[in-house]
A protein has these predicted regions:
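N-terminal activation segment of mature serine protease catalytic domains
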Residues: 15-64
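Active-site region of chymotrypsin-like
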Residues: 52-54, 156-179, 184-187, 191-278
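Intrinsic N-terminal pre-sequences and regulatory tails
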Residues: 333-346, 358
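Short, low-complexity, Pro/Ser/Thr/Gly-rich segments in the mature regions of secreted, periplasmic
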Residues: 351-365
């Protein structure tokens, strides 16, 4: 009699943590424990209250001469680097699942984006700047090439779309503008507004411009693709109203690795995997959980009374104005001190004036 050997069933692959359009998170190196409130009180903050929110771009494998293949995910620079005015971030990137954050990779390349370019205070810098980052995917992390997303409240639009290749445009010279993509369709998946589709209206060396994709905070870095063939076109970068700018995917590969124009698809291959995605936490669920934790940590904190704080702010401004007037009468006029006082008290009065108005409006709704 032949003995039959029973083989163990193959282990199922873990759900994909790396997925185009999925949420991406980053934490500060040393998150502050408290925040100073305008009332002078301190608000205790949990670590998760400092999480940086972005979305994942296209993922695949790099094939570079003389090097081992490397799995990477492409996204926006401002999603993987410390932004001005914010705590320094770790070089570790996570996806939210349940109440946890699961690590999936680390930054291996990116360009520098100035504060003036990101906050649109220098429009020409905003137009010209590149905005790209490359995240190496950790060993053992499952990825999928299916682009999809859920919006802030968990809403879903459309079906998963396979990312097939990179749209390798002719590389434009600095300052050159082209409309060879005018009217071509473009869709994006992002972790805040989900999937939206629109039309391309033009491009520059480091920008694919569209009208109506409506990026908002948290969508940054997410994949932009051509719905006709699944080609990755860009990653969400910045917006001015309905005008959106995506960082071209082909320029990421060219800039980061010196790949010649027209050779991008030889150097980067989107993953063939169609593994099911992890059940990512929506941004709304995450915000609700973090807000509840902040309330728990500050249960003894007395909420401010806007009208009372406004009265205090006005009284303080009057007192300092009287003191400065007395000093001026004694020949001790200091323009810098006066400007500092004006700016400080204007900010305080404006803040509490707005809060008081908001409180009154809320009472009438």
């Amino acid at each position: 009699m032949l003995a039959l050997q029973v083989l163990p069933a193959p282990a199922e692959a873990a759900p994909a943590l790396v997925a185009p359009g999925a949420p991406m998170r980053v934490f500060p190196q040393d998150p502050p424990k408290t925040i100073d409130l305008p009332t002078g009180q301190k608000l205790t903050m949990p670590r998760d209250g400092w999480v940086g929110t972005c979305s994942q771009g296209p993922n695949g494998t790099l094939h570079l001469p003389g090097k081992e293949p490397q799995r990477v995910m492409l996204t926006a620079s401002h999603c993987v680097n410390t932004m001005p005015g914010f705590p320094e971030v770790k070089n570790e990137f996570y996806a939210p699942v349940g109440t946890e954050y699961k690590r999936f990779g680390e930054r291996v390349a990116s360009n520098h984006v100035t504060a003036e370019a990101m906050n649109l205070s220098d429009p020409m810098q905003s137009i010209r700047t590149a905005d790209w980052g490359v995240v190496r995917i950790d060993d053992g992390v499952t990825e999928t090439g299916l682009s999809h997303s859920r919006d802030f409240n968990g809403g879903v639009q459309g079906e998963p779309v396979k990312i097939t290749r990179v749209r390798d445009f002719r590389t434009l010279a600095p300052g050159e503008v082209s409309v060879d993509n005018f009217g071509q369709p473009i869709c994006k998946d992002g972790a805040t507004t989900g999937r939206t589709c629109a039309k391309q209206i033009g491009r520059t060396r480091n920008g694919i411009y569209s009208w109506g994709l409506n990026y908002v905070q948290g969508d940054s870095g997410g994949v932009n693709y051509d719905p006709r063939d699944g080609a990755a076109v860009g990653v969400s970068s910045m917006t001015l109203g309905p005008l959106g700018k995506a960082q071209p995917v082909d320029r990421i590969i060219e800039d980061a690795y010196g790949i010649p124009d027209g050779k991008v698809n030889e150097a980067f291959t989107p993953t063939d995997s169609t593994a099911p995605r992890e059940n990512f936490t929506t941004s709304g669920e995450e915000e609700e959980r973090v807000s509840a934790e902040i309330e728990r940590l500050n249960s003894n904190l007395k909420p401010p009374a806007p009208r009372e704080e406004l009265r205090k702010a006005v009284d303080n401004a009057k007192q300092e104005a009287a003191g400065l007037a007395q000093k001026a009468s004694q020949g001790q006029f200091d323009p810098a001190e006066v400007n500092r006082a004006i700016n400080h008290h204007s900010d305080r009065i404006g803040y509490w004036g707005g809060a008081s108005l908001g409180e009154e409006i809320a009472k009438r709704l």
